[in-house]
């Protein structure tokens, strides 16, 4: 892993998390993602908006929002993140054994696993791997969910997995169009809201 600046204030944490999202992982100025070269039936793409709010134990809140375009062929993925004006802030590229974050200023961070990359950049665990599944309306493999609720079609609508309380709704053929993720950490609560605007 490459070096990353140390401990993060809520504002720095929000800024760094924004670069990952989401999410998306993430406004409406983002174009429809093009299929990845050599992609087959497993091609999955989503375009949308995100909002992240961190509430400190003293009641102070920090919030950021923007857009995302997620393209995933099952083996690798590409996540472009934009600010509210539509300018690209970062790109995250992942494939087995490698995850790379490239910021608009050219700075790059790399790790063997996307969750490790996120934790290195943010100083806090982020479910990048889980997000790949949750965007498709699936539970993350290898982590048993608590409090699992399903809709009439058997799709997950509420659960807790890997420390995140997730609510998925407004399903279309690809998955949920609204994801609300919450995590309680010592001294703060993190709320992530993803809204899909284009399939």
UniProtKB/Swiss-Prot annotation:
<keyword id="KW-0449">Lipoprotein</keyword>
<dbReference type="InterPro" id="IPR029046">
    <property type="entry name" value="LolA/LolB/LppX"/>
</dbReference>
<comment type="similarity">
    <text>Belongs to the LolB family.</text>
</comment>
<comment type="function">
    <text>Plays a critical role in the incorporation of lipoproteins in the outer membrane after they are released by the LolA protein.</text>
</comment>
<dbReference type="InterPro" id="IPR004565">
    <property type="entry name" value="OM_lipoprot_LolB"/>
</dbReference>
<keyword id="KW-0998">Cell outer membrane</keyword>
<keyword id="KW-0472">Membrane</keyword>
<dbReference type="GO" id="GO:0015031">
    <property type="term" value="P:protein transport"/>
</dbReference>
<keyword id="KW-0813">Transport</keyword>
<keyword id="KW-0564">Palmitate</keyword>
<comment type="subunit">
    <text>Monomer.</text>
</comment>
<keyword id="KW-0143">Chaperone</keyword>
<feature type="lipid moiety-binding region" description="S-diacylglycerol cysteine">
    <location>
        <position position="29"/>
    </location>
</feature>
<feature type="signal peptide">
    <location>
        <begin position="1"/>
        <end position="28"/>
    </location>
</feature>
<keyword id="KW-0653">Protein transport</keyword>
<dbReference type="GO" id="GO:0009279">
    <property type="term" value="C:cell outer membrane"/>
</dbReference>
<dbReference type="Pfam" id="PF03550">
    <property type="entry name" value="LolB"/>
</dbReference>
<keyword id="KW-0732">Signal</keyword>
<feature type="lipid moiety-binding region" description="N-palmitoyl cysteine">
    <location>
        <position position="29"/>
    </location>
</feature>
<dbReference type="GO" id="GO:0044874">
    <property type="term" value="P:lipoprotein localization to outer membrane"/>
</dbReference>
<protein>
    <recommendedName>
        <fullName>Outer-membrane lipoprotein LolB</fullName>
    </recommendedName>
</protein>
């Amino acid at each position: 892993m490459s070096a990353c600046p140390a401990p993060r204030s809520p504002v720095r944490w929000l800024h760094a998390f924004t670069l990952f999202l989401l999410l998306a992982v993430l406004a409406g100025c983002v174009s429809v993602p093009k299929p990845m070269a050599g992609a087959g039936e497993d091609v999955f793409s989503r375009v949308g908006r995100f909002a992240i709010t961190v509430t400190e134990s003293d009641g102070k809140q920090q919030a950021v929002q923007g857009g995302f375009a997620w393209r995933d062929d099952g083996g690798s993925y590409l996540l472009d993140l934009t600010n509210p004006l539509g300018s690209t802030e970062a790109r995250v590229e992942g494939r087995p054994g490698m995850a790379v974050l490239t910021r608009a200023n050219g700075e790059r961070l790399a790790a063997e696993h996307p969750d490790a990359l996120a934790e290195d950049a943010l100083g806090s665990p982020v479910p990048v791997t889980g997000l790949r599944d949750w965007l498709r309306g699936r539970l993350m493999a290898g982590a048993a969910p608590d409090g699992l609720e399903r809709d009439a079609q058997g799709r997950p609508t509420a659960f807790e997995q890997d420390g995140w309380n997730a609510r998925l709704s407004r399903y279309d053929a690809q998955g949920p169009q609204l994801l609300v993720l919450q995590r309680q950490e010592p001294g703060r609560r993190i709320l992530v809201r993803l809204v899909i605007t284009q399939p």
